[in-house]
UniProtKB/Swiss-Prot annotation:
This is HTH-type transcriptional regulator MurR. Residues 37-56 bind DNA. It comes from Escherichia coli O139:H28 (strain E24377A / ETEC). Homotetramer. The gene is murR. GO terms for molecular function: carbohydrate derivative binding; DNA binding; DNA-binding transcription factor activity.
Length: 285
């Protein structure tokens, strides 16, 4: 029996940790080539030995054998699917019913949230919130879907009194970056961490003495190396994607947590401003 089939059919037989491993492997099967048992263990908050035992439970000698088998199965499955159906997004194909599509999308987003939340270092997150709270000026950078996440965060921060710039034009982003000062904060949102526009802005911000906070993936990247602080996000999306759906879900979970943390830090005044904002917008109706 194929390992992917074994994993799908044995759900009720898995322990809590084994189910975490199974969910991760199914969601990230297209990216297993670059995943080690150590990385998995850190990301899932379990021991490496648990991963090895999981592989052996399925009949493999160890994680390496299981990983290579899964990669082979995924490649063969993709070739077969390519001949009969069009990939629409991630694992969703033109043969799927709307019910199946809904289940796949929901599971993809659930996994992105679960795996991102599992990575949070709350002491570091608290430090980041304190740094942002003291910033005279905040710049948020991002491209495409990440820019939408950034714009949403900028609206939330402005509502509670922060001075924020979040421009869609990359030339304006670069111009703002070079004008930052010591004490200012740049929040750079990029899942890949390698977009040249975002990296250029981060370089400029660091040069000016600003603090760079990156919301990015676990992968080593130019942005990750430039940042003073990183907030990690996980997305199970593959190269077969029509839009960064679960990536945005993961990023939004981080930015929403930052916002609520900042509200909590100055709760009385923040709630007053939120109330005033609500009253003003009600008058526009």
């Amino acid at each position: 029996m194929l390992y992917l089939t074994k994993i799908s059919n044995a759900g009720s037989e898995f322990t809590e940790n084994e189910q975490k491993i199974a969910d991760f492997l199914q969601a990230n099967v297209s990216e297993l080539q670059s995943v080690s048992s150590r990385q998995m263990a850190k990301q899932l908050g379990i021991s490496q030995s648990s991963i090895v035992k999981f592989a052996q439970k399925l009949g493999a000698q160890g994680f390496t054998e299981l990983r290579m088998a899964l990669i082979g199965e995924y490649s063969a499955s993709r070739e077969k699917t390519n001949a009969t159906a069009l990939h629409l997004h991630s694992s969703i194909t033109s043969d799927d019913s709307l019910e199946v599509i809904a289940r796949k999308l929901n599971r993809e987003k659930e996994l992105a949230l679960e795996q991102t939340c599992a990575l949070f270092d709350y002491a570091r997150l608290q430090k980041i919130i304190e740094v942002i709270s003291k910033a005279p000026f905040i710049q948020i950078t991002g491209l495409g879907g990440s820019a939408l996440v950034g714009r949403d965060l900028s609206f939330k921060l402005m509502k509670i009194g922060y001075r924020v710039a979040c421009e869609a034009d990359t030339h304006v982003q670069a111009t703002v970056s070079q004008a930052l000062k010591k004490g200012d904060v740049q929040i750079a949102i990029s899942y890949s961490g390698s977009k040249k526009e975002i990296v250029l802005c981060a370089e400029a911000a660091r040069k000016q003495g600003a603090t760079v906070i990156a919301i990015t993936s676990l992968a080593d990247s130019p942005l990750r190396r430039l940042a003073h602080f990183t907030l990690d996000t996980v997305s199970g999306e593959t190269e077969w994607r029509s839009s960064s759906m679960s990536t945005r879900t993961a990023q939004n979970s981080v930015t929403d947590l930052l916002f609520v943390g900042l509200v909590q830090l100055n709760d009385v005044e923040s709630l007053k401003m939120i109330q005033r904002s609500s009253e003003l917008t009600q008058r526009l109706k």
